[in-house]
Amino acid sequence: MADRILTPPLPDYLGPHQPGITDPVWPAKAPTGFDQAKYGALYAGQLERQRHLHVITADVASRTREELAGLLWTLTGFARHQMAKVPPSDTQRPYDEPVVTRRVTVTVGFGATLFTTIAGDDRFNLAARRPASLKVMPQIDGDDGFRPRDHATDLVILVSSDDYYVNEYIFGRLYYGGVHPGIRVRSVERGYARPDSREPSGFEDGITNPRDASGPSSMHDFVYIRAEDGEPEWCIGGTYLAYRKIRRRMKHFFELPAQDQEAVFGVDKKTGVRLEPHQAHAHAAKINPRRPNHRDLFDMDDLERRFLRRPYFFDDGLDADGEELRGLHHLSFARNLGVQYEWPVLMWQTNPDFPVKGTGQDALYGPGGAANIGGGYYFMPAAANDADHLGTGLGLKREHGGIDDAVQV
């Protein structure tokens, strides 16, 4: 390889989908002067996440459809403006490397309660337009004091960039009502991406993630809804987000010998290659099986149930017992929430009789292992064109001129 450094890919701000889902992504072909084989193995078609993530959940205080339309119009304009901003040159020191872009993405999703409240109220007359698979996240084995129903929200806003303080600024504008007074922030979670492709305990991660490497976009095939998927028409080009905040109790795990750590995951720690033979309750075998020549009751191969993972790590210090509070923000994007996400989680991972009767729980979630402590289901609509907002497909029309001055900061 030439003595050069690759410039990270930029988000896709002009495509039909919201930025921050299947982008930024490395091009399939290596730039001139780079070894195509090495590039193909390590970069081609892979997500190149920004360094920092804020997961912001919020409810809407709007009382009418008109007010909700105004809120979504303003939020859409705010997101566009933040993504289009160029880093100011007058704040950089004269001998620092110029910052050309911070690769900001602001990605908005709708929760089930926007369509029907927990109490069953169709407050905005949107129930008939609810995406087919969207619901409040169900309780599952592995939830540790987390009741998804109590944490269901109307909106999720994913803010990603290479600058932590940019994320904080955007969060502050939303939290303090500077974007729209009807946005009531419920929570914020902060995450970071490792510069390599390893997860918190040091294992190679993401080897089986769909790529954009060749031909029709395989990543998009797994992620974005099509006309034949039986969804409301406005959902075409959108995707589902299954978000879980997963706590990892690392002290116990790191006390295990390396061989036992690998047995928990079912893969080689350095390479990520699956161990053969592996234990039936190993994490890889439970959530990501690869059974040759196997088709299930719905005539689907295991590989057809994949989803796109976009993980970030968190480190929230120590809990009340003095134990470190760290783990993974597990963001999963899928075209069909039931087929691609709930089936692997409910029928495989948490099923004590998968892959064979008496297997037990996923080894990663064993005593002193992992636990779900947050999350939710959301629908991420397609990108809005310049004349519309993210709620236009819901029939929420708003008479407007330009972008509100309040969002242009």
Give each language-model segment a name.
Residues 2-409:
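Long, histidine/aromatic-enriched segments associated with O2/redox biology
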